[in-house]
C-alpha cells in the first residue's frame, strides 16, 4: 500500500475495509479494499478475499466496478477500484421506510418509475454476470451502489462463485476468530448469503443457482415497489421459509403498483424454482415491456416497394443537401419515395432490410403532409440507419438535423435485419431485431403525415413495408381535430376548438393539454407573423396553467416562447423553475425530455447555450447521454478543458459524469445555480481541492454573494470539525486564508494585503489568487501591479509553475506598460520561436500583441488572423476577430465572450486605439454585470 496515499475510510465489512486513496502514479482517486488486519494471517480468508477480487476483475460491464490492481505478494492483501460518488440502495430505501410523507426530491428518487429504471440496470448486470458463468449469491440493497450520475453498480463479490465449480465448503464457511474483537460475527457452517434474500431451497441447504439469484432480485424489486420487505427473518431467531407473500399492490395501494408488476414480482418470488423466471433475461424482458408500454398492433396496409400506386412520388435526391450532419458522401444519389397514404396518430412500421441496403444507408421519415412534394420532405422526424465496419449506427433526425445518435456492434455474418419503427402517444422508438435501439419523446403537436423512405436501391427492402395501427388508436383523442387545424396552420380555428375542450374538461388532463396547445398555436402564429404582442399573448396563455396539476407545462411553454425570442436566460430560468418546483408532477418528464432535446439541438447548431443544457441534462436526465455522445462531448470540450485553470493544475483526466465536469460547464457558461450543490457534495466528501476549485470559479464569475454565504459556511464547518484523516492535497485551514484573499481582491486591496498569507498557502491557491488578481487589474488599467504581485509570489511556486502561469501575465504587464523591448526579450528567452506561430500556445497571442505595439497594425492583423478557424483555443479568440470571417457571437459561451473582450482590450491598447480599448472595457463590465447566457 506504499504506492497509495490513504485519505479516509469509506466502508467496512465482515472481511474487508474500504478506503478512499490517492494514486500518485496515475493522478487519480481510487477505492482501496484490503483484508482486515486481524484476519490477514488466516490463509483461508486471504484465499476467499483474493477470489472476490479476481472474479470482479474478470467481469467487464458498466454495472460492475472494474479492478485496477490486485496485491497479494505482501502481508497486506488488497485491491483497488475506481472511486464512485454515490450511496447504496439500502440507504435510499432506509431513508423512506415507515415515513408518512416524503420531501419532493426523495419522493421522486423512490417513485415506482425511478426504481424500475434502476432495477432494469441491475437485471442487465446480473444477466451479463450469469452469461459469464458466475453466480453472485448475495444480492441485496447493501451491495447495490447508486452513483450521483445514474450509475447502478453491483458491489461485493466475496460470495460469488462460478457455476462450473462446486461450492467450496471451506471457502464458504464463515470462520470465527478467537480472541478477535469480531469473534462473534459469524457461526461456523453458516450458508453464505443473507437470509432475508435467500430462496427457500437455499435456506434448506440446496446449492446456489441462477434461480436463487432471481429470487433475490424478486425480493429487491418487492422492496422497491412497496418500500417494505415481503417477510423478515429476525436476528437470533430460527430462519423460516415463508409460506405466503402478500401481493405488492395489496401491501402498498398508495404506490399505485400495476397488476402486471405485481405478477412479475410474485413469479420471481415463487417458492418452487420451476415456477420462477427461467433466466434474468426473461425477467428483464418483462420489465422492459412495462417500461415501454408496449401496445397491441394490428396490420392495416402493406406498402409495396415496387408498386407505383402506393407512392405519391418517387425520385432521386442528393441526400447531403437535406441532411448535412449525416456521414454520407456529398456525391451519392438516393431514391426518395413518399407514400400516398397518411399514417395514423399511433403507427408501427415493420420491414426487413438487406445488409447491403444498410451499408449504403437507409432512412425512414414521417414528413408533413403539406408541401411534401415541394422539397419539404425532410421536415419532421425520421431515423437514419447505417452500417460501417460491422457497427450499426442509428440517428434520430428532425428538420434535417441529427439530434440523437447511438451505435452498436452487429454479427459479421448477419445478412438481414428486421426493423420496427413506432410512433405512439408522445414517443418515437426504433427496434432492430426485436431490441430497442432508440426512444425519443416529443410532446408538441406533431406535423407528421405521410411515410417517407430513403435508400440507394429500393430492392434492398425485402418484401413490403407493413403499416400497423395501435389498438389504442381506435379511440380518437378529442384533441385530434384542433391538432389537424394546427398542422394546417389554421391557428384561429385550432384555438377556438382547443378553448371548447378547456371548457368541457375543467380540471382534467384533456383540458390542461388543450390549454397548453392554445399557447403553442398562439406562439406559432406570432412566430409566422413576427408579432411581438403575439409572443406576450402566448406567455399569458401558458400562465393559465399556473399551480395546476399540469403546472410544469406553464414553464415548458414559456421556455418555448423565450427560445423563439432568443432570450436564453429567461428560457433556462423557466425550465429550472419547473424542475425545482414541480419535480413530482407527472408532466415534469416532458420538461426533462425537452432539456435533452435542446441539448442536441444546441450542440448541432454549435450554439453557446449547449453548455447550459449539457449541465442541465447531467442533473435531470444523465441516463439520456450514451457513451458515444459522451465521447463526442468531451472531444468538443478539449479546448475549454485545456484553457481552464483548475483543470490544467490537476493532471488527472476529467470524467464526463463527475462533479468536476459540472464545475467546468458552470465556469464556461457562466451558469451558477448548481454551485451550492457542488459545494455541499464536496464538503460531504471532505474534498478540499474541489472546494478551492468551486470558490475560484465563483470568484472568477463575480459571484460575491455565493462567496459570502458559503465562505462563512465553510469557515464554520472547518472550525467545528476535527480533522483526523490524512490529507494529501489542500489543508482546510488554507481555505480560510484563501477566502480572505478573495475578499481582498473584490475590494481592490493593495498587493501586500491580498497576498499577505502567501507563505502558508498551497501553490494551487496562490496561482488561483494570482490569476483572478491579474485579470482584474488588467481590465481596470492597472497592469503594472502584476509585476509587484509576481515579485511577492515567485518564490512560493515552482519554476515550472512560474513559467506556465505567471510568465504570460508578466509579458501582458509589460505590454500594458508599452515596453516593447522587454516583451521581446521575455518572448525570446522563454518561448521557442516555433510557438510564436502555434495558435494553441500563449506565445502566439503575445507575439501578436507585440507586433501591434511595435510594428504596423497590418502585420499584427495578418499574424493573428493565421489561427485555425476550427477548434480555436479560447486564449486565441482574438485571432478569429482579426480574420476576414470575423466572430459569430452565437457560438461563444459567456467565458469565451469575456476572454475575447479582454483580449481586444489589450490588442487595442497595444495599437494605441484608446477609444476602442475603453469601449471594450465598458462592454466587459456590462457582460460581467448582466452575464447573459
Curated annotation (Swiss-Prot):
GO terms for molecular function: ATP binding; protein serine kinase activity; protein serine/threonine kinase activity. Residues 4-291 form the Protein kinase domain. This is Serine/threonine-protein kinase PknD. Keywords: ATP-binding, Kinase, Nucleotide-binding, Phosphoprotein, Serine/threonine-protein kinase, Transferase. It catalyses: L-seryl-[protein] + ATP = O-phospho-L-seryl-[protein] + ADP + H(+); L-threonyl-[protein] + ATP = O-phospho-L-threonyl-[protein] + ADP + H(+). HAMAP family: PknD_kinase. The active site is at residue 138. Pfam families: Pkinase. ATP binds at residues 10-18, 33. InterPro entries: Kinase-like_dom_sf, Prot_kinase_dom, Protein_kinase_ATP_BS, Ser/Thr_kinase_AS, Ser/Thr_kinase_PknD, TPR-like_helical_dom_sf.
Amino acid at each position: 500500500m506504499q504506492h497509495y496515499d490513504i485519505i479516509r475510510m469509506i466502508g467496512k465489512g465482515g472481511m474487508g475495509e474500504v478506503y478512499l486513496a490517492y494514486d500518485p502514479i496515475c493522478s487519480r482517486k481510487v477505492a482501496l479494499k484490503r483484508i482486515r488486519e486481524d484476519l490477514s494471517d488466516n490463509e483461508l480468508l486471504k484465499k476467499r478475499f483474493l477470489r472476490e477480487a479476481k472474479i470482479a476483475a474478470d467481469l467487464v460491464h458498466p454495472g460492475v466496478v472494474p479492478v485496477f490492481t490486485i496485491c497479494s505478494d505482501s502481508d497486506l492483501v488488497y485491491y483497488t477500484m475506481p472511486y464512485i460518488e454515490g450511496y447504496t440502495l439500502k440507504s435510499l430505501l432506509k431513508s423512506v421506510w415507515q415515513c408518512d410523507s416524503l420531501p419532493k426530491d426523495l419522493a421522486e428518487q423512490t417513485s415506482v418509475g425511478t426504481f424500475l429504471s434502476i432495477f432494469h440496470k441491475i437485471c442487465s448486470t446480473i444477466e451479463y454476470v450469469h452469461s459469464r458463468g458466475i453466480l453472485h449469491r448475495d444480492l441485496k440493497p447493501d451491495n447495490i451502489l447508486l452513483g450521483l450520475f445514474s450509475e447502478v453498480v453491483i458491489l461485493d463479490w466475496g460470495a460469488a462463485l462460478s457455476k462450473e465449480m462446486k461450492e467450496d465448503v471451506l471457502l464458504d464457511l464463515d470462520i470465527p476468530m478467537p480472541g478477535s474483537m469480531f469473534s462473534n460475527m459469524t457461526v461456523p457452517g453458516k450458508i453464505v448469503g443473507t437470509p432475508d434474500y435467500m430462496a427457500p431451497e437455499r435456506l434448506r441447504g440446496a446449492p446456489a443457482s441462477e434461480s436463487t439469484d432471481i429470487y433475490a432480485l424478486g425480493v429487491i424489486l418487492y422492496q422497491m415497489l412497496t418500500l417494505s420487505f415481503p417477510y423478515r427473518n429476525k436476528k437470533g431467531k430460527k430462519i423460516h421459509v415463508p409460506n405466503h407473500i402478500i401481493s405488492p399492490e395489496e401491501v402498498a395501494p398508495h404506490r399505485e403498483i400495476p397488476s402486471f408488476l405485481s405478477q412479475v414480482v410474485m413469479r420471481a418470488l415463487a417458492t418452487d424454482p420451476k415456477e420462477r423466471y427461467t433466466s434474468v433475461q426473461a425477467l428483464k424482458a418483462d420489465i422492459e415491456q412495462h417500461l415501454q408500454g408496449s401496445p397491441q398492433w394490428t396490420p392495416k396496409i402493406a406498402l409495396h416497394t415496387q408498386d407505383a400506386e402506393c407512392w405519391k412520388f418517387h425520385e432521386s435526391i442528393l441526400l447531403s443537401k437535406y441532411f448535412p450532419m449525416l456521414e454520407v458522401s456529398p456525391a451519392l444519389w438516393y431514391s426518395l419515395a413518399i407514400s400516398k397514404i397518411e399514417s395514423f396518430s399511433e403507427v408501427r412500421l415493420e420491414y426487413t432490410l438487406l445488409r447491403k441496403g444498410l451499408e449504403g444507408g437507409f432512412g425512414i421519415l414521417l414528413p408533413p403532409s403539406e408541401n411534401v412534394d415541394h422539397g419539404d420532405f425532410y421536415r419532421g422526424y425520421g431515423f437514419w440507419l447505417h452500417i460501417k465496419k460491422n457497427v450499426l449506427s442509428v440517428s434520430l433526425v428532425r428538420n434535417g438535423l441529427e439530434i440523437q445518435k447511438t451505435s452498436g456492434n452487429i454479427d459479421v455474418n448477419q445478412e438481414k435485419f428486421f426493423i420496427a419503427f413506432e410512433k405512439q402517444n408522445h414517443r418515437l422508438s426504433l427496434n432492430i431485431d426485436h431490441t430497442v435501439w432508440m426512444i425519443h419523446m416529443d410532446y408538441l403537436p406533431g406535423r407528421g403525415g405521410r411515410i417517407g423512405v430513403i435508400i440507394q436501391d429500393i430492392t434492398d427492402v425485402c418484401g413490403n413495408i407493413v403499416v400497423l395501427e395501435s389498438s389504442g388508436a381506435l379511440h380518437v383523442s378529442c384533441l385530434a381535430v384542433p391538432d389537424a387545424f394546427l398542422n394546417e396552420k389554421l391557428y384561429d380555428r385550432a384555438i377556438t376548438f382547443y378553448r371548447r375542450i378547456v371548457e368541457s374538461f375543467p380540471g382534467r388532463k384533456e383540458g390542461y393539454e388543450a390549454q397548453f396547445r392554445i399557447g403553442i398555436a398562439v406562439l406559432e402564429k406570432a412566430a409566422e407573423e413576427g408579432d411581438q404582442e403575439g409572443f406576450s399573448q402566448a406567455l399569458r396563455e401558458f400562465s393559465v396553467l399556473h399551480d395546476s396539476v399540469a403546472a410544469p407545462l406553464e414553464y415548458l411553454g414559456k421556455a418555448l416562447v423565450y427560445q423563439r425570442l432568443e432570450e436564453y436566460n429567461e428560457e433556462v430560468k423557466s425550465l429550472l423553475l419547473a424542475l425545482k418546483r414541480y419535480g413530482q408532477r407527472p408532466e415534469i418528464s416532458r420538461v426533462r425530455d425537452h432539456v435533452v432535446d435542446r441539448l442536441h439541438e444546441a450542440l448541432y447548431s454549435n450554439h453557446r447555450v449547449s453548455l447550459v443544457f449539457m449541465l442541465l441534462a447531467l442533473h435531470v436526465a444523465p441516463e439520456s447521454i450514451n457513451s458515444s455522445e459522451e465521447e463526442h462531448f468531451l472531444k468538443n470540450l478539449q479546448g475549454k478543458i485545456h484553457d481552464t485553470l483548475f483543470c490544467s493544475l490537476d493532471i488527472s483526466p476529467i470524467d464526463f459524469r463527475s462533479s468536476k465536469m459540472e464545475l467546468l460547464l458552470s465556469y464556461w457558461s457562466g451558469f451558477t445555480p448548481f454551485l451550492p450543490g457542488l459545494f455541499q457534495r464536496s464538503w460531504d466528501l471532505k474534498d478540499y481541492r474541489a472546494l478551492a476549485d468551486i470558490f475560484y470559479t465563483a470568484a472568477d464569475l463575480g459571484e460575491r454573494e455565493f462567496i459570502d454565504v458559503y465562505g462563512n459556511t465553510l469557515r464554520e464547518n472547518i472550525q467545528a470539525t476535527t480533522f483526523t484523516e490524512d490529507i494529501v492535497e489542500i489543508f482546510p485551514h488554507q481555505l480560510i486564508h484563501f477566502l480572505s484573499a478573495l475578499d481582498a481582491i473584490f475590494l481592490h486591496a493593495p498587493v501586500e494585503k491580498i497576498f499577505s498569507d502567501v507563505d502558508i498557502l498551497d501553490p494551487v491557491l496562490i496561482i488561483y489568487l494570482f490569476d483572478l488578481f491579474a485579470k482584474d487589474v488588467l481590465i481596470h488599467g492597472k497592469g503594472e501591479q502584476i509585476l509587484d504581485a509576481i515579485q511577492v509570489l515567485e518564490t512560493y511556486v515552482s519554476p515550472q509553475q512560474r513559467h506556465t502561469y505567471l510568465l504570460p501575465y508578466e509579458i501582458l504587464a509589460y505590454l500594458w506598460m508599452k515596453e516593447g523591448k522587454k516583451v521581446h526579450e521575455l518572448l525570446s528567452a522563454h518561448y521557442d520561436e516555433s510557438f510564436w506561430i502555434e495558435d494553441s500556445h500563449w506565445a502566439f497571442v503575445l507575439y501578436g500583441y507585440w507586433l501591434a505595439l511595435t510594428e504596423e497594425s497590418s502585420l499584427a492583423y495578418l499574424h493573428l488572423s493565421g489561427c485555425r478557424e476550427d477548434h480555436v483555443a479560447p486564449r486565441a479568440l482574438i485571432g478569429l476577430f482579426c480574420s476576414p470571417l470575423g466572430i459569430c457571437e452565437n457560438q461563444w459561451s459567456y467565458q469565451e465572450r469575456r476572454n475575447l473582450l479582454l483580449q481586444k482590450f489589450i490588442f487595442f491598447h497595444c495599437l494605441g486605439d484608446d477609444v476602442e480599448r475603453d469601449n471594450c472595457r465598458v462592454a466587459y463590465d456590462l457582460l460581467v454585470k448582466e452575464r447573459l447566457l
